[in-house]
């Protein structure tokens, strides 16, 4: 089990750090009183491997409970529980700027100067920082860069590469464009099986319909160009911090062309090792005569 304790200065980026760890599959708890760490650790270790990665945020908000941190860490060590400390730091100037921009009060100086609170906090956290396994100074890091730093330390390579979850979604324009779409492609320019008597009753999931749609040169050119564009977009979306991508492909009713094309794109992405799901939102709507969808 990997047990990470996240701490550091207020305003240094602990919230973003815990979100990044959560994206990496860590079970995360924010602001757990240090006195509860031993019992929490015991409970997690007793799950028999169901919980493999844990991250706790411990900070000055814990008040007097924070003083119990070292006793809890001593207990963990004596009981053989391995843990790591991640310390988030930043310069006084940057912290002051962040507090002013957020209009938040410093927890150790709610009615006084921000700098005084920062100084008090630095003194209280000095020993924790000295014990830290990893220290990240966020003074000059953008959110994306902090996420990358977290990934480099705590992420597994195959997990990082497949962290963007892709959903390929077919739909019918007559029922509305899916509201959560990131990319929308209109395939109503392709030959329509709906007007072929022996194909109308089937869907794009059926081989005879799929073969018909994919038999045209225009279809193959479109699929190839779309795949090339996705090969370019996906790593750049990931680089900018996107963790979910919804690719919506629409035709008139969402039963024939969009389904066949969505399946082709899904198979192509899957063959390249992406974590990808497929959903045909309106495949049965022409049968049920449903209304507008989200």
Curated annotation (Swiss-Prot):
Keywords on record: ATP-binding, GTP-binding, Nucleotide-binding
Bilayer-crossing regions: none
Binding site for ATP: 8-15
Gene3D superfamilies the UniProt entry points to: P-loop containing nucleotide triphosphate hydrolases
GO molecular function: ATP binding; GTP binding
Positions that bind GTP: 59-62
Family to which this protein belongs: Belongs to the RapZ-like family.
Role according to the record: Displays ATPase and GTPase activities.
Name used for this protein in its record: Nucleotide-binding protein CLK_2809
